[in-house]
A protein has these predicted regions:
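N-terminal intrinsically disordered, low-complexity, charge/repeat-rich segments that act as generic
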Residues: 1-13
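Short, conserved turn/kink motifs that form compact alpha/beta structural patches or helix kinks used as
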Residues: 9, 19-108
């Protein structure tokens, strides 16, 4: 049985910079990962001072078509489109042969 096809590059229009925790309370130097997809879920706040925050969402990183792809640990920071997000969860999605197909990062 053949593995799953990679996520098409045309569906991966975004880029991000990943900073993993350095073990000393800070973050390591940023690593660029291009050809990812950021799907934002924006929350609205009605407090008279602001209408919306940067939101949260999911980042899809393809194992083959995302340049610089790696398994991003929870607790890392990712910068996408001028906003910085915390990686709350990294879910590894495998094909039928047990190889990594893509990762889904839950960010907030």
């Amino acid at each position: 049985m053949a593995g799953l096809r990679p996520i098409p590059a045309r569906l991966l229009p975004d880029a991000m910079v990943v900073r993993v925790p350095d073990g000393r309370g800070g973050f390591a130097e940023g690593v660029a990962v291009s050809h990812v997809r950021f799907a934002r879920t924006q929350s609205v706040v009605d407090d008279g001072h602001r209408g919306a925050d940067a939101g949260a969402g999911k980042v899809y990183v393809d194992a083959l078509n995302s340049d610089g792809a790696f398994e991003v640990p929870a607790g890392s920071r990712v910068d996408i489109g001028g906003h910085s997000y915390l990686v709350a969860e990294c879910r590894r999605c495998e094909d039928f042969n047990g190889h990594v197909h893509h990762w889904e990062l839950t960010v907030r």
